[in-house]
Amino acid sequence: MINPVAIRLGPFSIRWYAICIVSGMLLAVYLAMKEAPRKNIKSDDILDFILMAFPLSIVGARIYYVIFEWAYYSKHPVEIIAIWNGGIAIYGGLITGAILLVIFSYRRLINPIDFLDIAAPGVMIAQAIGRWGNFINQEAYGRAVKNLNYVPNFIKNQMYIDGAYRVPTFLYESLWNFLGFVIIMSIRHRPRTLKQGEVACFYLVWYGCGRFIIEGMRTDSLYLAGLRVSQWLSVILVIIGIVMIIYRRREQHISYY
């Protein structure tokens, strides 16, 4: 089993979970800043947004998780703030981040569609990296299986949980997001391929489809009224993404990326 603590500095410790999250965020910021000039967005605007949105999105992701696990946290309120032990929901962070992005864009007189377009690839690769934090924390896994001979030993050993091997759903989602990142980075600058806003739409459809399938394999899903919340949200993302693509394709006045 991999030690979830990467570095100890006296009474303080730095966990692999935090390293994965922060590494993904830094890469996302780099990619957004590199693309920002194409959309006439200042690098300072990117940094200002990240400094505001990153901590608030983490809080939003935690609140989302706690709400759907209230039966546990109502009895252990002290653990609500123990975010270093894991327990954040990506959808909570995405919803919070999207709301903040729209508000920030209007305040800075930035087209929010452009901002979403430059942010989407970075978010996708950040999610791919962040899932490895779940791996080290032994969370976001699937049902028990007899063996995991198709994965490297270090993954197989870490996925031995509660006396059984578990489907490495974290790995599936990480690879799915990485593949989506490669695709969108390969086509977004091709002439007359994507219209303004369609990079973000691609993210909605791609991530929504993958998450819907992978969520069905997990055993730690958040439920509401007996239904997997993330699957419902995935369906909503896919519908929004497809509707927006159809609309943007029909409107001649919308420019290409």
Curated annotation (Swiss-Prot):
It is a multi-pass membrane protein. Its EC number is 2.5.1.145. It comes from the Bacteria. GO terms for cellular component: plasma membrane. The keyword Cell membrane applies. The chain crosses the membrane at residues 12-32, 49-69, 83-103, 109-129, 167-187, 197-217, 226-246. It is an enzyme of class 2 (transferase). Pathway: Protein modification; lipoprotein biosynthesis (diacylglyceryl transfer). Keywords: Cell membrane, Membrane, Transferase, Transmembrane, Transmembrane helix. Pfam families: LGT. The keyword Transferase applies. A 1,2-diacyl-sn-glycero-3-phospho-(1'-sn-glycerol) binds at residue 131. InterPro entries: Lgt. NCBIfam families: lgt (TIGR00544). Catalyzes the transfer of the diacylglyceryl group from phosphatidylglycerol to the sulfhydryl group of the N-terminal cysteine of a prolipoprotein, the first step in the formation of mature lipoproteins. HAMAP family: Lgt. Belongs to the Lgt family. This is Phosphatidylglycerol--prolipoprotein diacylglyceryl transferase. It comes from Streptococcus agalactiae serotype V (strain ATCC BAA-611 / 2603 V/R).
